From Swiss-Prot:
This is Proteasome subunit beta type-3. One of its GO terms (biological process) is proteasome-mediated ubiquitin-dependent protein catabolic process. It comes from Oryza sativa subsp. japonica (Rice). The 26S proteasome consists of a 20S proteasome core and two 19S regulatory subunits. The 20S proteasome core is composed of 28 subunits that are arranged in four stacked rings, resulting in a barrel-shaped structure. The two end rings are each formed by seven alpha subunits, and the two central rings are each formed by seven beta subunits. The catalytic chamber with the active sites is on the inside of the barrel. Non-catalytic component of the proteasome, a multicatalytic proteinase complex which is characterized by its ability to cleave peptides with Arg, Phe, Tyr, Leu, and Glu adjacent to the leaving group at neutral or slightly basic pH. The proteasome has an ATP-dependent proteolytic activity. InterPro entries: Ntn_hydrolases_N, Proteasome_beta_3, Proteasome_bsu_CS, Proteasome_sua/b, Proteasome_suB-type.
Length: 204
């Protein structure tokens, strides 16, 4: 078993019209044994920027703490929040710096940039970025997430439709992966508000 599959995970981000949504499952397991059913994988950097960390849970939490530290230093120095593109470069550099003993994480970054333009990207454990204009996925359920997102995604979705689409894609995907699931957590971010929602799924 790959170390990336040890805890199980499913993270997906999707772009709409001047908005984005990022979602994850809530299961923390040790291989096939379930340890927690309310585990957080999506973290806030600031009001318009979020990161989802799939992979090894301990590394995800350590990496998040280092990223918060770096972002707070940036805020003190620049007196403004980081743009999503800048933050993606920071995460990439941080991961590549540790390439010989990497954090076993695959980050998904989603944010609203200038003119409320949505930005999403993902990367591997050594910081190789993959930018997208529609959706990005990571985690043990990534294969089924790709299929679900490709069949359900439409460009320029309104926030309500985007929320429904990403929720359905996550739910149908984790049902096909025994290492992730136990409901989901969805964040919908528009220029004026942030909507958080816990969705119920199959609890097995």
């Amino acid at each position: 078993m790959s170390i990336f599959e040890y805890n199980g995970s499913a993270v997906v981000a999707m772009v709409g019209k001047n908005c984005f949504a990022i979602a994850s499952d809530r299961r923390l397991g040790v291989q096939l044994q379930t340890v927690a059913t309310d585990f957080q994988r999506v973290f806030k950097i600031h009001d318009k920027l979020y990161i989802g960390l799939s992979g090894l849970a301990t590394d995800a939490q350590t990496l998040y703490q280092r990223l918060v530290f770096r972002h707070k230093l940036y805020q003190l120095r620049e007196e403004r929040d980081m743009k999503p593109q800048t933050f993606a470069s920071l995460v990439s550099a941080l991961l590549y710096e540790k390439r010989f003993g990497p954090y076993f994480c695959q980050p998904v970054i989603a944010g609203l940039g200038e003119d409320n333009e949505p930005f999403i990207c993902t990367m591997d454990c050594i910081g190789a970025k993959e930018l997208a204009k529609d959706f990005v996925v990571s985690g043990t359920a990534s294969e089924s997430l790709y299929g679900a997102c490709e069949s359900m995604y439409k460009p320029n979705m309104e926030p309500e439709e985007l929320f429904e689409t990403i929720s359905q894609a996550l739910q149908s995907s984790v049902d096909r992966d025994c290492l992730s699931g136990w409901g989901g957590f969805v964040l919908l971010v528009t220029p004026t508000e942030v909507k958080e929602c816990v969705i119920k799924g199959r609890m097995d």
